[in-house]
């Protein structure tokens, strides 16, 4: 019996992302994905059992600054995006949308969802956030509008230095986790669960969310991030 083939993730420049077609569906998936991703970030925070490394930093900064967590997410996203310049990275449409919308979605959810009390409810919230994050990340990746600013930073360093993505990711995420914890961010069960399960969760849903693009675009391509060179979007934190 022939196996059903799923659409592939493609290396696209920002211009190719626009020319790849199916824009209404892709834009819808992009913003639904980012909204779910931001909501999941907020639920992790409300659960109080620890967040993803970058969110530990976001939360830690929010305890020291008169700014909402969403505002900090947006501002830090722009700072990370500036680091793309010496790496000669090119942001995609999804990269810009990520910077602008993720923090707004997180703030709206934090306004709607009160702090969660009781260990059983907190664990249930973490589990729900992992699923929501996985769906959101898969929709975002499947729209094929470029990596998030933090993943683009990692792939840019990889392309310029030749260091492994695993090493770069580990160094960056351990660093932001440590800084965030020192600033007052929460590290706990949710942090460990995110590290272990967000990759499999996103990968599971990705099989249904990758949008089929035009064949003419499929035959060529250089991914947003580094013109003319492949720049694989990591599945684990593609919306980071």
Regions found by a protein language model. Give the residues of each.
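Core subunits and conserved enzymes of cellular information-processing
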Residues: 2-240
């Amino acid at each position: 019996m022939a196996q059903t083939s799923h659409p592939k993730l493609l290396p696209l420049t920002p211009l190719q992302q626009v020319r790849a077609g199916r824009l209404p569906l892709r834009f819808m998936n992009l913003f639904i994905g980012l909204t779910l991703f931001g909501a999941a970030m907020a639920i992790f925070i409300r659960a109080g059992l620890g967040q993803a490394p970058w969110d530990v930093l976001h939360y830690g900064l929010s305890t020291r600054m008169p700014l909402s967590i969403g505002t900090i997410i947006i501002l830090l996203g722009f700072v990370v995006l500036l680091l793309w310049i010496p790496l000669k990275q090119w942001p995609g449409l999804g990269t810009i949308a990520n910077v602008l919308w993720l923090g707004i979605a997180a703030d709206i959810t934090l306004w709607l969802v009160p702090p969660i009390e009781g260990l059983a409810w907190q664990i249930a919230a973490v589990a729900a956030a992992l699923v929501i994050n996985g769906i959101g990340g898969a929709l975002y990746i499947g729209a094929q509008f470029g990596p998030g600013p933090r993943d683009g930073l990692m792939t840019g360093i990889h392309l310029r230095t030749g260091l492994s993505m695993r090493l770069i990711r580990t160094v960056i995420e351990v660093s932001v986790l440590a800084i965030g914890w020192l600033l007052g961010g929460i590290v706990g069960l949710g942090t460990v669960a995110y590290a272990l399960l967000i990759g499999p969760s996103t990968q599971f849903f990705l099989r249904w969310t990758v949008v089929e693009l035009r064949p003419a675009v499929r035959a060529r391509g250089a991914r947003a991030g580094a013109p003319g060179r492949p720049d694989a979007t990591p599945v684990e934190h593609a919306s980071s």
